[in-house]
């Protein structure tokens, strides 16, 4: 995979020309739709930007279309909870696309408290020739109307309209960390630190609580929910991860309140590796079902793990993302970096996995060849047709010319949010306030 990934080129990068990064511009989520033709990003300023893939050029039929801005809208505004005297941030925590049912597209976006359903439609025609209205829409003087005409549709410049269809509020006491659309295309779930709710997409005033781990006495609280996702094919199954590093697979057919899991996936801790930071670094920051539905991918602070749904005792694969940080956990704890929540992603065939790291690095692991590569998303590599070169972090004194010392890593540059096109080798990488989109130089599989 190393050699093949070597030849990946940048497709497009969307760079905001700021000499400084404003907090509102920091990208907080990235998500392809089910066809990969649209890509949505959310930021800390509550905005959603949708990119659309351009059609392939007739002059170069084998060249891939690039992604251009399709629509931008303000999804959430800052609010204030007067009962609790708390500010509610406008930051977009998650975006999830709904499967397309007609010409329009729909997506869910959420901040800490409120989930919204948006409809995206196109208009390239407008009616003309009204009998009682003029071109500006004003009513005509009826005495001047002497004939009856049939209104016609005339072409116009393409207009993309985004409208809010539903607002799902008051469902969560704690901060929402994830949303997931069910395969039945009628329901979705939202999870906060202690509860998971099931919603119907057409009903906004009530939801069903399907998981509640809040203890009677909050002093007895030992773990929180960190992420959740529906199974891609079985609408009754979902998984949620915890800050203790465990995964619980639940079946909604068993009970209305899924307090008792169907399966518990947990890796026994090695006593020799026990330290003050063990529990913090074992917290699962993201969980993703494979496209096949057979496996689950989880990310904790130092590793990504692949779990087989049929084997609860331990993961079938473990990949070290940045093991060289193990000796620096103390300083990472002091700077709060140890609490960073990295996401992970599968490629379309479930054969390669991807996750982010520090210094604007991101990692890819080929499950078949067991090869891995470290790549960098940077302004230097953002020129069209630029080739990404593998990077290497060294720990000891000896290092090659292009190696980077672990002591020179920039921990303010972190890639937390990544997404992979559902069918092709196209990836989206959010690096602070910049979005990078990379694709294969040739239309071939990575491995």
UniProtKB/Swiss-Prot annotation:
GO terms for cellular component: cytosol; protein phosphatase type 2A complex. GO terms for molecular function: protein phosphatase regulator activity. InterPro entries: PP2A_PR55, PP2A_PR55_CS, WD40/YVTN_repeat-like_dom_sf, WD40_repeat_dom_sf, WD40_rpt. Highly expressed in brain. Gene3D superfamilies: YVTN repeat-like/Quinoprotein amine dehydrogenase (2.130.10.10). WD repeats lie at residues 22-61, 87-128, 171-209, 220-260, 279-317, 334-375, 410-446. Keywords: Repeat, WD repeat. It comes from the Eukaryota. The B regulatory subunit might modulate substrate selectivity and catalytic activity, and might also direct the localization of the catalytic enzyme to a particular subcellular compartment. PP2A consists of a common heterodimeric core enzyme, composed of a 36 kDa catalytic subunit (subunit C) and a 65 kDa constant regulatory subunit (PR65 or subunit A), that associates with a variety of regulatory subunits. Proteins that associate with the core dimer include three families of regulatory subunits B (the R2/B/PR55/B55, R3/B''/PR72/PR130/PR59 and R5/B'/B56 families), the 48 kDa variable regulatory subunit, viral proteins, and cell signaling molecules. Interacts with IER5. Belongs to the phosphatase 2A regulatory subunit B family. This is Serine/threonine-protein phosphatase 2A 55 kDa regulatory subunit B gamma isoform. The lineage of its organism: Eukaryota, Metazoa, Chordata, Craniata, Vertebrata. The gene is Ppp2r2c.
């Amino acid at each position: 995979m190393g050699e093949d990934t070597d030849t990946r080129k940048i497709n497009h990068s969307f760079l905001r020309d700021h000499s400084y990064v404003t907090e509102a511009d920091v990208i907080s989520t990235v998500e392809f739709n089910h066809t990969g033709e649209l890509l949505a990003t959310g930021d800390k300023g509550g905005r959603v930007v949708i990119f659309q893939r351009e059609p392939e050029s007739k002059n170069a039929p084998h060249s891939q279309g690039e992604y251009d801005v399709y629509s931008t809208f303000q999804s959430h505004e800052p609010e204030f909870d007067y009962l609790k005297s708390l500010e509610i941030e406008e930051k977009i925590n998650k975006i999830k696309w709904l499967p397309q049912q007609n010409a329009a597209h729909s997506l869910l976006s959420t901040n800490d408290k409120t989930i919204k359903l948006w409809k995206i439609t196109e208009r390239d025609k407008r009616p003309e020739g009204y009998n009682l209205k003029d071109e500006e829409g004003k009513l005509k003087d009826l005495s001047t109307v002497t004939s009856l005409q049939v209104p016609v549709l005339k072409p116009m410049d393409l207009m993309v309209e985004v409208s809010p269809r539903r607002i799902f509020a008051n469902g969560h006491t704690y901060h929402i960390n994830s949303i997931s659309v069910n395969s039945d295309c009628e329901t979705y779930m939202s999870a906060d630190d202690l509860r998971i709710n099931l919603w119907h997409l057409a009903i906004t005033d009530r939801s069903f609580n399907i998981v509640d781990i809040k203890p009677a006495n909050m002093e007895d609280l030992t773990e929180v929910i960190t992420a959740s996702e529906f199974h891609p094919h079985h609408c009754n199954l979902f998984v949620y991860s915890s800050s203790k590093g465990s995964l619980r697979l639940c079946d909604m057919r068993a009970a209305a309140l899924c307090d008792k899991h169907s399966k518990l996936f947990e890796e026994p801790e090695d006593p020799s590796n026990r330290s003050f930071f063990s529990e913090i670094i074992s917290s699962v920051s993201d969980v993703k079902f494979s496209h096949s539905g057979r496996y689950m991918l989880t990310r904790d602070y130092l590793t990504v793990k692949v779990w087989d749904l049929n084997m609860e005792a331990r993961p079938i694969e473990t990949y070290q993302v940045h093991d060289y940080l193990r000796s620096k956990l103390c300083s990472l704890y002091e700077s709060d970096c140890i609490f960073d929540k990295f996401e992970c992603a599968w490629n379309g065939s479930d054969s390669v996995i991807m996750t982010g790291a520090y210094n604007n690095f991101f990692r890819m692991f080929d499950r078949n060849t067991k090869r891995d590569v470290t790549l960098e998303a940077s302004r230097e590599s953002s020129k069209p047709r630029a080739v990404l070169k593998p990077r290497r972090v060294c720990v000891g004194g000896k290092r090659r010319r292009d190696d980077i010392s672990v002591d020179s890593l920039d921990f303010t540059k972190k890639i937390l949010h990544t997404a992979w096109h559902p069918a092709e080798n196209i990836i989206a990488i959010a690096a602070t306030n910049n979005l990078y989109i990379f694709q294969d130089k040739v239309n071939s599989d990575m491995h």
